[in-house]
Amino acid sequence: MHNPTPRTESPNALAFIKRFFAAEAAGGLILMAAALAALIVANSPLADSYFAALHTVLAGMSVEHWINDGLMAIFFMLVGLEIKREMLAGQLASWSQRALPGFAALGGMVVPALIYVAFNWGQPETIGGWAIPAATDIAFALGVLSLLGKRVPLSLKIFLSALAILDDLGAVLIIALFYTSDLSIPMLLAALGSIAVLVALNRLGVKKLLPYLLIGALLWFFMLQSGIHATLAGVALALCIPLGKADEEASSPLLHLEEKLHPWVAFAVVPIFGFANAGVSLAGITVDKLVDPVPLGVALGLLIGKQVGIFALAALAIRAGLARLPDGSNWGQLYGVAALCGIGFTMSLFIGALAFPGAPALVDEVKVGVLIGSVFSALLGVVVLRRFGARG
């Protein structure tokens, strides 16, 4: 693949980053509205119609399945495009740039998982959900961050974005390694063949997007049938899209596709996913239910594990001289961003559905834990950033 050398951000690239944050932030606010609407509908007289619609079968799969395996492949494709762009020519282009978000992302995945495991140890039916609190929802987090305006320096927003992208990369690897069902070898070979064709297109210097997208659609089908989660086709396709000239959208297939996908993902795909997956009936939720191992492990993994893991490892890296605070920021702001990373919504709900297939009661417990952990993480992050923002 084409590997441009790290560079100083051009005005075009800076404009692209500003559009990126604007779309993510606005998309995060719409996602909040979609999640709230799902909760209201799921606890209203429309609840039966809501759940019936999600379970309606179209072309052999339920609507919910189409959303989680189909639409979310587009979300994961965008994640893959962001990872590749940042790794080759962006905020993660060198090891020094990767150090702070890298250490932070590692802590933000390991500590929440350990907290979940601590609450679910010895429970084979629930221990498989250990990865649920290990993910950060970049759209939600940036949406909340946008409410604080100029109290938060751009460097912190870039840090949060880089951290979340590495977090997403970790989540993709977790899904591939730990949440893959029984494999169909013929379909897996067909998927690998599709990836080989995509790599060949890249090596041959093909810049037209249509051949990549057509082969990518085949790859999605083969992965769906292979037992590997179909959304990973989006990541594989994205990593094969050529970057070209990273400072010119017109000559960069990757930037062009990323620019086209952003509004669709931010304003359609993710809100639809949120509306389809956040709906949970609260009728049977009691205090006793809230302290069950799954919701407690998920909620505390997000609320406590994220902020402790991210802040502790980031501070360790800074104190050891391996990284430095983002420009114009302070320790309080870094802690506030660490707290915001406890907003796990989209990826946490997604992993929850993979962890407990055929166990709707456990999936509902995951939803409650994710909602509680995410809401309190958002509130804590806002309070801390408002307190320390004037010094940013």
From Swiss-Prot:
Give the membrane topology, semicolon-separated if more than one.
Multi-pass membrane protein
Listed under catalytic activity are: Na(+)(in) + 2 H(+)(out) = Na(+)(out) + 2 H(+)(in)
Top-rank taxon: Bacteria
Q: Name one GO molecular function term.
A: sodium:proton antiporter activity
For the keyword Cell inner membrane, the answer is yes
Q: What is the predominant subcellular site recorded for this chain?
A: membrane
Role summary = Na(+)/H(+) antiporter that extrudes sodium in exchange for external protons.
Name the UniProt record assigns to this protein: Na(+)/H(+) antiporter NhaA 1
Disulfide cross-links: none
Q: So which residues are the signal peptide here?
A: none
